Amino acid sequence: IWFEPTFHKHVKTLCNGVQIHAEGPSYDHAAFRPWRVQALAFKAIRALYPDYDLWRDFPYEYAFGKLPIDVINGGPGLRLWTDDATATPADLNVLAAADEEAWEQIRQPYLRY
């Protein structure tokens, strides 16, 4: 999609991105893993275009000395998995499982339904 932000650092700049609509009769909220969708998209881009400059190297949110993707994801795990040509989706499951389980335990007391 194309959009033009009305505030913040990209105000009045034509930007583009991807929007995924997860809906429909077969949609399963408990099974849908949006982080994994974008991780697999990165992996597909890397496989199809191995020389593509996927990781931007400018400072992000005042975090100097780290790649923005590592800041956003809390570490280099996603980037390293994406760049490893031998890494599989099953490896991503192992990489994400501990954090997902910890998050599930933290959020449980706050769920209302």
Regions found by a protein language model. Name each.
Residues 1-93:
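Conserved functional hotspot residues or short segments at active or partner-binding sites
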